[in-house]
């Protein structure tokens, strides 16, 4: 299954953190967008396990991304002058916030369409940010290590928890920090257990976004 570079209907929305207004182009309607991509696939392609990875979930501004952005804004000293990696960046709001706070940010995602939307949002918010396509499930790491690794709502599949734990560890430099936001996914505890088994404990807090409690986890490596 190949990405079709579909021109999904979009709209713009804004968020403000600190003194900075962020303008984001988002997919107008996720169900409509999924219907559009399904129309480009044969019935056989729709059954391909990889087809799910091409669904444009990246185009939604999820509460977990907003919560992570808010947390970073509230804890700017965790980011300032640090080398920062975001995995699964989607629209890129946390990366934009981290960049504005003085982080040297590399935003990454696996979906082939993310780069176009992320770079648009950089322009909309009058910012310059670096982006690279990355499948963090792969064991090879050509990116090197980072002071801070961030991610929002990345524990959405059963196969992810230990892979995420091991993947994150590969990207964090000794003495570095991992910051994740999660809406309470069912695989969260498995991930925390995997991190604990590596001798890494977490500090937990929460942020409410649109009446939804989002958990924030900070790990010191």
What are these regions (language model features)?
Residues 1-221:
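S-adenosylmethionine-dependent methyltransferases
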């Amino acid at each position: 299954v190949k990405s079709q570079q579909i021109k999904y209907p979009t709209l713009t929305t804004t968020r403000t953190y600190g003194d900075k207004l962020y303008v984001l182009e988002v997919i107008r309607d996720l169900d409509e967008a999924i219907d559009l991509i399904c129309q480009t696939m044969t019935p056989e392609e729709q059954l391909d396990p990889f087809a799910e990875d091409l669904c444009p979930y990246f185009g939604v501004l999820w509460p977990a991304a907003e919560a992570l952005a808010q947390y970073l804004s509230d804890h700017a000293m965790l980011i300032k002058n640090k080398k920062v990696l975001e995995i699964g960046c989607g629209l890129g709001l946390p990366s934009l916030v981290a960049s504005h706070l003085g982080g040297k940010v590399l935003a990454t995602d696996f979906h082939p369409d993310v780069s176009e939307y992320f770079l648009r949002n950089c322009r909309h918010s009058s910012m310059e940010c670096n982006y690279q396509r990355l499948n963090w499930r792969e064991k090879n790491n050509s990116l090197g290590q980072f002071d801070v690794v961030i991610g929002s709502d990345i524990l959405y599949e059963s196969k992810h928890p230990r892979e995420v734990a091991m993947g994150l560890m590969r990207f964090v430099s000794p003495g570095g920090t991992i910051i994740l936001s999660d809406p309470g996914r069912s695989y969260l505890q498995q991930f925390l257990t995997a991190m604990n088994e590596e001798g890494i404990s977490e500090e937990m807090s929460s942020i409410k976004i649109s009446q939804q409690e989002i958990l924030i986890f900070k790990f010191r490596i």
